[in-house]
Amino acid sequence: MRYVIAVKSPIYGKQGAFLAYQFAESLIKKEHEISQIFFFQDGVSNGNALVYPANDEVNLQKHWQMFSITYNVPLHLCVAASQRRGVVDNLTTPTTAHYNLAEGFTIAGLGEFIAASLNADRVITL
């Protein structure tokens, strides 16, 4: 089956983002396909390069990055939610010298999410 995973939970402080990561790992192990992971609302904090976990905490951002590289799954952040929460890339910031989008993440519009959702068998939101 083909899945799209939508993550609305912040990177830390709640369990939703970590559960989404665990679910994505399980899907791949069961040989399902994930066409994209879309972060929206507070979930865009998963793509903020300025988030530094404590040494004894899981580095969830690093896990997402490795997941994306290993399984070729794009990590998309909602452009509107990102801008409202101060997560910008070199194209969406007014000053191109300052951006904080983490490596491996892409800022995208709802159109990309909807297109992927239309081609998916399941859309899961966490």
UniProtKB/Swiss-Prot annotation:
The keyword Transferase applies. The active site is at C78. The keyword Nucleotide-binding does not apply. This is Sulfurtransferase TusD homolog. Keywords: Cytoplasm, Transferase. Its EC number is 2.8.1.-. It is found in: Cytoplasm. Belongs to the DsrE/TusD family. GO terms for molecular function: sulfur carrier activity; sulfurtransferase activity. Could be part of a sulfur-relay system. GO terms for biological process: tRNA wobble position uridine thiolation. It comes from the Bacteria. InterPro entries: DsrEFH-like, Sulphur_relay_DsrE/F-like, Sulphur_relay_TusD/DsrE. GO terms for cellular component: cytosol; sulfurtransferase complex. It is an enzyme of class 2 (transferase).
